[in-house]
Amino acid sequence: MKCAHFIDGPHCVKACPAGVLGENDTLVRKYADANAVCQLCHPNCTRGCKGPGLEGCPNGSKTPSIAAGVVGGLLCLVVVGLGIGLYLRRRHIVRKRTLRRLLQERELVEPLTPSGEAPNQAHLRILKETEFKKVKVLGSGAFGTIYKGLWIPEGEKVKIPVAIKELREATSPKANKEILDEAYVMASVDNPHVCRLLGICLTSTVQLITQLMPYGCLLDYIREHKDNIGSQYLLNWCVQIAKGMNYLEERRLVHRDLAARNVLVKTPQHVKITDFGLAKLLGADEKEYHAEGGKVPIKWMALESILHRIYTHQSDVWSYGVTVWELMTFGSKPYDGIPASEISSVLEKGERLPQPPICTIDVYMIMVKCWMIDADSRPKFRELIAEFSKMARDPPRYLVIQGDERMHLPSPTDSKFYRTLMEEEDMEDIVDADEYLVPHQGFFNSPSTSRTPLLSSLSATSNNSATNCIDRNGQGHPVREDSFVQRYSSDPTGNFLEESIDDGFLPAPEYVNQLMPKKPSTAMVQNQIYNFISLTAISKLPMDSRYQNSHSTAVDNPEYLNTNQSPLAKTVFESSPYWIQSGNHQINLDNPDYQQDFLPTSCS
């Protein structure tokens, strides 16, 4: 008989035993061979077998391997994730540190705030002391000394007449700053009707080198030649002053001290604005300047400037109107007899300077427009140029002067003037400052050799310094000294008063101090504006740390009034006109214009 399935010994079975308990309690595992006979598996095949030997043993379960692989994979993913996280975090930290460093560096740099204002490309020439020669003292004061001299540019065979303004050794840092501020303003302007700065010398004492004028200041000139000044000259001067002021307005510069004394005469046909001691440059977004104090010309100032210390181009227009009035009255003193402390109340009540006898109503109405309380109602300088230019084409129609057609101003040649001015100098190489600078395309570029000697010119073309006045002979008219260190200073030179009177000095009433004085006596600093001080006279003065300048217009000028004070002193003063030159003059210490403790009456 044949088994249907498998043979296990003597038995027929459906399947070979797998894990059946056999002899000696051992497990028996068998497999079916090719003849379907059950054979014993290899002892090492603990889970049965499919064939003989170890080869027949079945492979182990894959589940642990899969589990191990999954776990290992997960661990790898975690490690990779941590690595990526650490990398990103490190990158974030580096970026954060970089941004922090950039922000810190940016804080060290000022933020950009473009103003849209054109750059000031003016050049300032720094001169060596060996390049100029001092010839003669023009004047001295508390600020230092002004010399007449020659500028001899290094490497060139030319000599240029100049005025040298030198601060004294003991000058304060504030005075040095102010003179450098004036140098900045003067170096920033370049116009035929504005005085220019030739250079600056930075020695132990700062020195400004400016043009030298042959005819002095316009105020002296019209007083000396009032019988020979015709309508055409007066109107032409008005046009030129307006042109100079219009140029300053275009440069956003407020002059703050326009007056006939601050206009210099180059020739009878050519005048220039000077004295930038109070001038201020406005920023691109500034419409006005607020002053803090100092000596100011009260009788030339607009009402808003007196009351609120607000200065604009339109306040300069007011001063222009007063300057025109000075010209039309041949140097009369504005508001004569009225104390400076009362000017504001007088103006608020509607009073103005009277119509000059030679002026038609056309000319006077222009002045009146300049003195409107509302600054915006005053004419612009470009409008004043147009008005006076029209009048200058037909002078007798607008100014009525007796014998006008026969009037003629003297005009000495340069040769005569400079031989008088520089008696001991060789005249062959003398060149006018304008003639020297004209060939230069830049303001102060490299020197040019194409110049015409001054001796060949037939009209005087020299210039005075920004604050000096001398006459055609170099010694008749006084010279104005530094306008912001001496003239606007509270520092007295009172110990010179008696000797100054003996030498013919007189106080001038244009300026009053706005700064708080250290002591009341500082109000009585003498100012000798229109008297010449010779070298002999200077030698008689006591030699101490202060100097008295006979050519200043405002050391103690009463129109420069102090508004930085507490309540106005109620003393009433009287003073004679400062241009009176005869007699034994005594300085009236009760001059109302010499008050230090001043506030406008309306403000007290």
Swiss-Prot record:
Q: Which residues form the Protein kinase domain?
A: 132-399
GO biological process annotations for this chain's record? negative regulation of apoptotic process; positive regulation of epithelial cell proliferation
Question: Reaction catalysed by this chain?
Answer: L-tyrosyl-[protein] + ATP = O-phospho-L-tyrosyl-[protein] + ADP + H(+)
Q: Which InterPro entries match?
A: Egfr_JX_dom, GF_recep_IV, Growth_fac_rcpt_cys_sf, Kinase-like_dom_sf, Prot_kinase_dom, Protein_kinase_ATP_BS, RTK, Ser-Thr/Tyr_kinase_cat_dom
List keywords of the entry alphabetically. Answer: ATP-binding, Kinase, Nucleotide-binding, Oncogene, Phosphoprotein, Transferase, Tyrosine-protein kinase
Cellular component terms (Gene Ontology): plasma membrane; receptor complex
Annotated catalytic residues: D257
EC annotation? 2.7.10.1
Regions annotated as coiled coil: none
Q: Which PANTHER family match?
A: EPIDERMAL GROWTH FACTOR RECEPTOR, TYROSINE-PROTEIN KINASE RECEPTOR
Task: Please give the function described in this protein's UniProt entry.
Answer: The v-erbB oncogene transforms avian fibroblasts and erythroblasts in culture and induces sarcomas and erythroleukemias in chickens. It is a truncated and mutated version of the receptor for epidermal growth factor.
- Similarity-based family: Belongs to the protein kinase superfamily. Tyr protein kinase family. EGF receptor subfamily.
- Protein name, as recorded: Tyrosine-protein kinase transforming protein erbB
This chain's source organism reads Avian erythroblastosis virus (strain ES4)
Record gene name: V-ERBB
